[in-house]
Structure formats: structure tokens, C-alpha cells
Amino acid sequence: MKRTGPTDPNLRRLIRYLRKKSNEYGVKIWKDVAWRLERPRRQRAEVNVSKINRYANDGEMIVVPGSVLGAGKLEKKVIVAAWKFSETARRKIIEAGGEAITIEELIERNPTGSGVRIME
């Protein structure tokens, strides 16, 4: 059976945008994130805020090529960019003093991807 990729038009647009920016700025991180978002939904990343709290440092930029979920607590001030956020995850990130932004907003702020970590 032929692999078709994601059918969500917004996700397809984001993947094209990531590839374009990867070529434009000559950085591989955005191409890697695009590849991870292209995977089937059942293989896409689902990260709880407790995992972000465990592995991220204060002030760090984290990109999640999938969903951020609200299980656990977050005590660090981090910038998290993801495809989707649950309501509780977004609330917990903001309450901890961090930011919950889209992947496009992260690329606008940091087009070269320096200091950005991918978390799955």
C-alpha cells in the first residue's frame, strides 16, 4: 500500500514550511522535525509536562513534533513549541513562567535553530 502521509492540510502546510526554512537557512533541525511530523499519528510524539520538567533546563527552547499533554507538574521556565497542546499542558507551561508557542513562531524567533532541543 502506498504511503500517503498526513491528511490534515494544516500539518501538510507546516511540513512544507519546515522543509523550506531548512533549505533557506541551511539547518537540518527543521528537516528533522518535518520528518518526525510526517510519521503516522500513532507513532507521533506525545510528551507530558513531567518529561519536559525532568529533561529540560531553565530558559531552554524545546520543540515537540507532536502533542504536549498535561500529566505531571512543571517547575521550570521553558519555551515549548509543538504541533498541539492540551489545555492543561498549555496552562501548566504558562503558570510556570514559560511559553507555549507554535512551531512557526519558534522558527520566526530562532530561524537557525540554535539552542533548540527536540523532545519525544
Swiss-Prot record:
One GO CC annotation: cytosolic large ribosomal subunit
Alphabetized UniProt keyword annotations: Ribonucleoprotein, Ribosomal protein
InterPro entries: Ribosomal_eL18, Ribosomal_eL18/eL18-A/B/_CS, Ribosomal_eL18_arc, Ribosomal_uL15/eL18, Ribosomal_uL15/eL18_sf
Record bears the keyword Magnesium: no
GO molecular function: RNA binding; structural constituent of ribosome
BP-aspect Gene Ontology terms: translation
Domain of life where this protein originates: Archaea
Subunit annotation: Part of the 50S ribosomal subunit.
Database matches in PANTHER family: 60S RIBOSOMAL PROTEIN L18, LARGE RIBOSOMAL SUBUNIT PROTEIN EL18
Family in the record: Belongs to the eukaryotic ribosomal protein eL18 family.
HAMAP family: Ribosomal_eL18
Name of this chain's protein: Large ribosomal subunit protein eL18
Organism from which the protein derives: Pyrococcus furiosus (strain ATCC 43587 / DSM 3638 / JCM 8422 / Vc1)
